Amino acid sequence: MTLRALILFFLACLPAQAQVFDESVSPPNLRSRAFLLVDLQSDTVLAQKNSDVRIEPASLTKLMTAYLAFEALYQKRLSTEQRVVVSEKAWQAPGSRMFLEPGSEVSIEDLLKGLIVQSGNDAAMVLAEAIAGSEDQFVVMMNREAQRMRLSDTKFVNATGLPAPEHYSSARDLVRLASDIIARFPEYFTLYSLREFVYNEIAQYNRNKLLGRDPHVDGMKTGFTDSAGFCLLATAQRDGRRLISIVIDAGSDKARTSESQKLLNFGFEHFETRKLYSKGDVVHEIPVWKGSTSQLPAGFSGDFYVTVPNGRWQELRAELESMQPLLAPVRAGQSIGMLRLTFDG
């Protein structure tokens, strides 16, 4: 059951989504400390465990590092062909690396591939310095963007995801961040499907082992530290639907792969997503007092999708909550009522 606000549809606003929760569909039994599965089109949570608990994100931090790099490219503050110098500090970055040489020049395109495919901490550092001048200033940008996205359980201390006090996120926040990358930067999202990258004559393979194993999986990012455990945020598209899954502290590389696969299969096999209303559909005529017209049409400003368990679409019911007449003047785009979605019985 869910409530969603109706708006006066003649003003373009963000499209609305709905969630219809049905406890009769049991999620797979996973050992991961936290997990989350979301249908991207309807923004519906299909399975979750500890999704709002603050966790150490490890290299999933690099989702935000990449996001800010994509934003800089979009704003033409960077270009993929631009070459930047590798600092001594970046070269000394511990952990996973793309094996940059200090003082050498490297293109932004190669840095992005090293960041995404090889999870290079050195690549993250060079990108941070190229965008903000220093990693410290880049972290300020990361946290500012997290606040703008309303990632309420996220705080960054570095651009790499190396363990640090007060460096944390949550499964829900990371899925929201990944969703924004997919929606805003489709031309760069394709980098997450690369299975191999060769730099400095060293070939490294994408640690997301679902790539190639499941033809529907086309990204996104792994993470690991001793304290964070094995993490994987994955996304797949099948029959026009896109799902995003995340597992935190799965126990092993093999486990994070298999548990992510279980989540994605569960979402595709047990649920369907359909359009309930199209943009501009008149859902209801709202009475208006003391206006130039006695009624105003109300609906959703964007296509309105609903995800339901397989076989239950015909049982779905949409009811308007009791609404009082509006008093003119009425502001276009204002929320004017609630739509309740339920199943019969």
Segments predicted by a language model, with ranges:
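Compositionally biased, intrinsically disordered/low-complexity regions enriched for serine, proline
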Residues: 12, 24-25, 306
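Domain-terminus/edge residues, biased toward the C-terminal soluble/receptor-binding domains
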Residues: 151-155, 163-168, 172-345
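Short amphipathic alpha-helical leader/targeting segments
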Residues: 13, 57, 79-83, 129, ...
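Hydrophobic h-region of N-terminal signal peptides that target proteins for export
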Residues: 9-19
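Sterically constrained small-residue positions within well-ordered secondary structures
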Residues: 9, 26-28, 48, 236, ...
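Sec-dependent signal peptide recognition
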Residues: 1-8
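Active-site-adjacent loops and short helices of periplasmic peptidoglycan-processing enzymes
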Residues: 18-184, 196-200
